């Protein structure tokens, strides 16, 4: 069956982080997007603007996923999906739709579970088995599958941990909150649905177990609800972890941290990225060693704005009417960032209220200078007083 958004991790984000030069901080512009005759949409039918891969995983944002695969190349995504153990892929799946789980023949739940178990197993694939041994009543081994036939490293250990950390956010603040069973046990997962809710899935794991739940009809009928796979995942996983010690996923030594701007994935500009009108965009992200960005944010800009005109201040704008503001640059129309964007037209225009004439008009009249202290006062002469005649 179709794996829906659970395949975003497999065919897009795993190769993007492992070999595509991307990090969890890398951004794409979540805005209206069309390739050829195909227009892509998000489940929410909203567009968030510049969005990081971490957030795109957490909130299951389609457009960021498709643009990321477009960047790294469809062939790379297909190659990684094959290496994760999917045997049903065909050449017709070599298109951007693979990033959203749009596959010609779909996948089996067993192979999807094995792929997610690969991430949980620090990137190492183990061929799945339904049993390890079958014994007779005397304890003699009748069937033995303790030896794994196929074992290979699909993604780097660091990549597996980074994907896991992002999928932990899915459980606590994203599309998988309904599946989260608490108890202090670390949990990572990814939800998935297909067109008209014909398929509903939840794939996730803990430091102990991996579980994938698919729900749908044999005849591919439309479903009215898609949350029940999460409920089932939660019920099963909570029960089998009841007596297990709570623990987190072990972080590899090759993981480091750095402060970046959420709108560019690059190093924040001092007094710029933290002055975004929506609040500071600086946050701390995890990186594999050697992938921390070295360039500064290129999606924020600081401008001097004249309050009287609301435009870029010119040379004649009074200082007491000029303020510094932070804007987004490069945002596409239709996205949440666009209302905060300094467009090319805005950048090329300046204040049309203040000019040389208004500057002269606003100059106060000069007061006469006070005389110096040693200046002698000018002599004054009173007019002669002529005695009045006494008229009788």
Set out the residue ranges of the language-model regions.
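Secondary-structure transition/capping motifs at alpha-helix termini
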Residues: 17-26, 87-89, 121-126, 243
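A penicillin-recognizing enzyme superfamily signal
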Residues: 106-299
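Intrinsically disordered, low-complexity repeat and linker tracts
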Residues: 145-147, 258-261, 271-273, 278-285, ...
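Mid-domain, small-residue-enriched loop/turn segments at the edges of structured enzyme/sensor domains
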Residues: 39-41, 73-114
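Conserved catalytic neighborhood of penicillin-recognizing serine enzymes
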Residues: 21-77, 125, 137-169
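Structural recognition of the beta-strand scaffold that forms the well-ordered cores
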Residues: 26-27, 55, 65-68, 80, ...
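Active-site SXXK
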Residues: 2-28, 56, 115-119, 163, ...
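Periplasmic/cell-envelope proteins involved in peptidoglycan metabolism and beta-lactam response
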Residues: 1, 23-26, 81, 94, ...
């Amino acid at each position: 069956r179709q794996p829906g958004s659970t395949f975003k991790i497999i065919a897009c984000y795993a190769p993007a982080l492992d070999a595509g030069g991307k990090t969890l901080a890398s951004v794409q512009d979540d805005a209206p997007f069309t390739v050829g005759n195909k227009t892509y949409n998000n489940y929410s039918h909203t567009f968030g603007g510049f969005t990081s891969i971490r957030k795109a995983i957490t909130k299951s944002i389609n457009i960021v996923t498709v643009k990321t695969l477009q960047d790294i190349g469809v062939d790379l995504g297909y190659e990684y999906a094959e290496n994760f153990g999917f045997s049903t892929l065909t050449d017709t799946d070599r298109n951007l739709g693979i990033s959203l789980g749009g596959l010609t023949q779909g996948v089996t739940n067993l192979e999807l579970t094995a792929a997610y178990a690969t991430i949980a197993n620090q990137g190492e694939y183990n061929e799945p088995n339904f049993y390890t041994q079958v014994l007779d009543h005397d304890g003699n081994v009748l069937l033995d599958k303790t030896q794994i036939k196929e074992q290979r490293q699909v993604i780097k250990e660091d990549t597996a941990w980074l994907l896991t950390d992002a999928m932990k956010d899915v459980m606590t603040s994203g599309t998988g909150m309904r599946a989260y069973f608490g108890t202090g046990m670390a949990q990572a997962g990814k939800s998935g649905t297909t067109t008209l809710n014909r398929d509903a899935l939840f794939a996730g794991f803990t430091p102990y177990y991996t579980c994938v739940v698919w729900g749908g009809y044999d005849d591919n009928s439309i479903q009215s609800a898609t949350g029940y796979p999460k409920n089932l995942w939660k019920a099963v996983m909570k029960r089998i972890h009841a007596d297990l010690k709570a623990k987190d996923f072990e972080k590899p030594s090759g993981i480091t941290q750095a402060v970046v701007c959420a709108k560019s994935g690059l190093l924040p500009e001092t007094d710029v990225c933290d002055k975004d009108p929506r609040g500071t965009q600086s946050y701390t992200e995890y990186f594999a060693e050697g992938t921390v960005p070295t360039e500064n944010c290129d999606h924020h800009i600081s401008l001097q704005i004249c309050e009287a005109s609301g435009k870029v201040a010119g040379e004649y704008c009074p200082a007491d009417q000029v303020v510094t503001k932070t804007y987004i640059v490069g945002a596409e129309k239709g996205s949440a960032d666009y209302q905060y964007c300094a467009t090319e037209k805005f950048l090329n225009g300046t204040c049309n209220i203040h000019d040389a004439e208004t500057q002269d008009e606003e100059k106060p009249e000069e007061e006469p200078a006070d005389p110096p202290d040693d200046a002698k006062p000018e002599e004054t002469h009173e007019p002669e007083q002529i005695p009045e005649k006494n008229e009788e």
